[in-house]
From Swiss-Prot:
Keywords: Ribonucleoprotein, Ribosomal protein. InterPro entries: Ribosomal_protein_uL29, Ribosomal_uL29, Ribosomal_uL29_sf. The keyword Nucleotidyltransferase does not apply. The gene is rpmC. This is Large ribosomal subunit protein uL29. It holds the Pfam family Ribosomal_L29. Belongs to the universal ribosomal protein uL29 family. Gene3D superfamilies: 1.10.287.310. The lineage of its organism: Bacteria, Pseudomonadati, Thermodesulfobacteriota, Desulfuromonadia, Desulfuromonadales.
Length: 62
């Protein structure tokens, strides 16, 4: 997910996106703990996506 794509979204859509990504991160951590995670690279990728959304949210609120 690119920051340029995120800048086109509204604040409400960005907040919803953060919730979705946090839920996905929780599920990935759970899969990792139970040994079911096939692609471990998705964990840092999801964390970075959350950080990108937070950055764009802060920019829009300023």
């Amino acid at each position: 997910m690119k920051a340029s794509e995120l800048r086109d979204l509204t604040v409400e859509e960005l907040e919803k996106k953060v919730e979705e990504l946090n839920q996905e991160l929780f599920n990935l951590k759970f899969q990792l703990a139970t040994g079911q995670l096939e692609n471990s690279a998705r964990l840092p990728q999801t964390r970075r996506d959350i950080a990108r959304v937070h950055t764009v949210l802060r920019q829009k609120r300023s």
